[in-house]
Structure formats: C-alpha cells, structure tokens
C-alpha cells in the first residue's frame, strides 16, 4: 500500500509510532541537565532562519555555538539509533525535528525533576503516576525540512546582555501572528526560553527582571505558578514557547507527511 493510498488512521498510526521511537531514544540519552544546551541549540537554529537543523549541521563553528558540539555529538548517536529502526521507505529523522524533540525532552524532564524535588521537600515519596496526573501536555509537530547550507549568521545573546537586548533579540525571530503587532517571541516566552537556556535559570531570570518591568511582571506570574503542585501556567507556556520557536512562523519548512512510508495492511493496526 503506497503512501498516497494510506488512510487518515494509518497516517496517524505511522506518525505516532515514529514519534514514540524518537521519544524513547531521546529519553535514554538526554536528561534534564541537558536542557540549557538543548534549548540553546534550538535558539541558535531558529535564529539563523528557522529550525532546519543548520545549527547542528553547518554552524557549530560560530561563536557561542562551539560549546554545543558535545551535545550535538550526543544527538548524532540518538539519530543513528532512530534511523536504524526506520521502516522500509521511511525517511530518517531530520536534524530540525531532532533539535526540537531534544529540547522538548530535556525541558519535560526538567519539569519532572522540579516536581520530584517538590514532593521530596514535603517528605512525600514521589511516584510517576502522581507526577503524570499533575503534568501538562507538551504538543508536538514533526516534519521539519533540513537546510542544505548554513543560514544567515546571528549570534546568541552574550551572557551579560541587557534585558532590552534580550527582548530585541527574541523579537527578531520569525513573524508576528496574523493581526498582531506583538513579536512571535514576546517578553513572556523570551523570559522562559532564555531562562531555560541558561546554566542557572533562576538567577538569569532574576537578573533580567531586575532591569525590566515587563520581564519582572512575567517572572512574578511564573513564580506564582511554579509554587503550585502542577505548575500549569508556567509549563503550558514553556511548551508553547518551545513549539512556537520551532514553528513555520519562525521559518521552519514543515511537511507533515515526511515520515510516512508504504505499508502492508498488517503493518498498521487500528485499535
């Protein structure tokens, strides 16, 4: 059965199996401690024309990107594992998708680590069921096309960049939503993403908030959320920020049929 004749259910099953394979491979290699590197790689990719894998493939010799080489080496092993399990006729995972999924995996694991620490601080034994019950979904979109060459150079902000410089840098990514004058990555997602990309996210958020009223308001909002058991407002907005950064609006070229492959009827079971 060729790709063009697949039913909607079959396409969904194939894409779900592919996603689960990618997630399993990443969770065995990427941890919460990798979140700063994973998010910085995603930022570097988005900044050079959209998430298309160019940061990992062609741009590791640029300034701050050089420090990401060990993390990219880890992702190469993950990619090899994912691709080795591809079905006949199925494309290997793109570097654009792997960059997005790695950031998603590391950030999700940092959420879990925060909840575990909160349970333990209260003298409660954490368990996966309880953590899952208070966790928010982290949306996924796959099918990013990889670049054939390096994108336009755009360095990540310096460690001592001012709040205004951070906001301006993020405002330069992608195009605003239709009918909106607000940047694609406005103050709130900028605070989340830059905090997540920093070795000490709490300290960096505090530094930015101390010098900018808009960022201070965003930090206060998320601090209140992070004091709750579910951390819903913070985690939902963080997931949206990561997805927005890797979206078509940031410059990614996305083909949702990228990982479909020919199948026999027996290969895709509808349950």
What are these regions (language model features)?
Residues 2-271:
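Long, well-ordered alpha/beta core segments of mature domains
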